[in-house]
Amino acid sequence: MPSELPLLTLTIWVPIIAGLLVLATGSDRNANLAKLIALIGALAGFFVTIPLYTQFDASSAGMQFEELTPWIATFHINYHLGVDGISVLFVLLNSFITVLVVIAAWEVVEKKVAQYLAAFLIMSGLMNGVFAGLDAMLFYVFFEAMLIPMFLIIGVWGGPNRVYAAVKFFLYTLLGSLLMLAAFIYLYFQANSSFEILEYHKLPLGMTAQILIFIAFFMSFAVKVPMWPVHTWLPDAHVEAPTGGSVVLAAKIGRASCRERVCCKV
C-alpha cells in the first residue's frame, strides 16, 4: 500500500536540509563532523527514495506519489510533484550517486570540506525536484537552481582555469534555458494561465507553434546534455572540475537533460 508520507518532498528536502546542517559546522576545524553529517544526510536521502521504488505500481500508467499544494496563487503556480516509471528510477539513481560522491570526498577534499559536501547534498535535492516537478515554473526553478552548486564546485575546488570553466558552464546553460522559459510562458497563456505540465500536451496548438516550442525545448536541453555544436562548455568543465564534480556532470546533469528532452510532455 502506498505510503501516506510526502515521499517526494522528503527526497528533495532531506538532502537540502542536510546540506544546510553541514554548512553550519563552519570551518575545516570541524571537517570530521561535516563529513559525518554529510554521510548521514546522503544515506537518509537515499533511504527515503527506496519506498518510491518498492511501492511504485508498474502496472499503472501516469504519475504516482503526487503532491499538490498552491505555491504562488496569483500566477497559478503550484508545488506539484509526481513521478512516472522513468522518473522514479532517476530519483533513486541520483540519491545513490550522491552517497558515492560524499564517500569519495572523505580522503580527497582538504579545504572548505563542509562547503564542498554541502554543495553536493543541496544539488542532489534540487535535482530530485527536476525529476519530480510537474508544475512548469517549479520545474524551471529546480532546473536552474541546480546550476549554482555546480558553478561553485567547479569555481572553488577546480583546477587552474576553474573560474573560466565555471563561468562558461554557467552562462551557456543559463542562456540556453531562457528559450525554455519563453516556451513555458507561451504555454502558460495558451493553457488559460496554467503552469501544469500534464495539461500542456492536451493543448490544440498549431503546427508552427508546436515546431517553435519543440525548438525552444530542444535547444535548452541540448545545451545541458550537451550536444554538438553547443557542447563546448563541457571539455573545460570536465577538465577543471574536481572528481566529484566530473561524476555529477557526467552522471547527473547530462542525464537529467536527456530525460527531460525525451520525457517532458510538451
Residue ranges and their predicted role:
Residues S3-V14, V83-N94, A136-P149, Q210-F221:
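Structural signature of hydrophobic alpha-helical transmembrane segments
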Residues V14, A18-L21, I37, G41-A44, ...:
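Hydrophobic residues within membrane-embedded alpha-helical segments of Major Facilitator Superfamily
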Residues M1-L7, V22-I103, E107-A118, S194, ...:
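Transmembrane helix-loop-helix hairpins at membrane boundaries of multipass inner-membrane proteins
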Residues D28-L33, Q115-I122, L126-A209:
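Alpha-helical multi-pass transmembrane bundles of energy-transducing inner-membrane proteins
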Residues D84, D135-I153, F169, V223-R261:
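Functional transmembrane alpha-helices
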Residues F56-N78, S177-A237, S257-R261:
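Juxtamembrane/interfacial segments at transmembrane-helix boundaries in multi-pass membrane proteins
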Residues G19-D28, T98-E110, L152-N161, V225-V239:
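C-terminal ends of transmembrane helices
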Residues I12-P15, A38-G41, N94, F120, ...:
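Residue-level recognition of transmembrane alpha-helices
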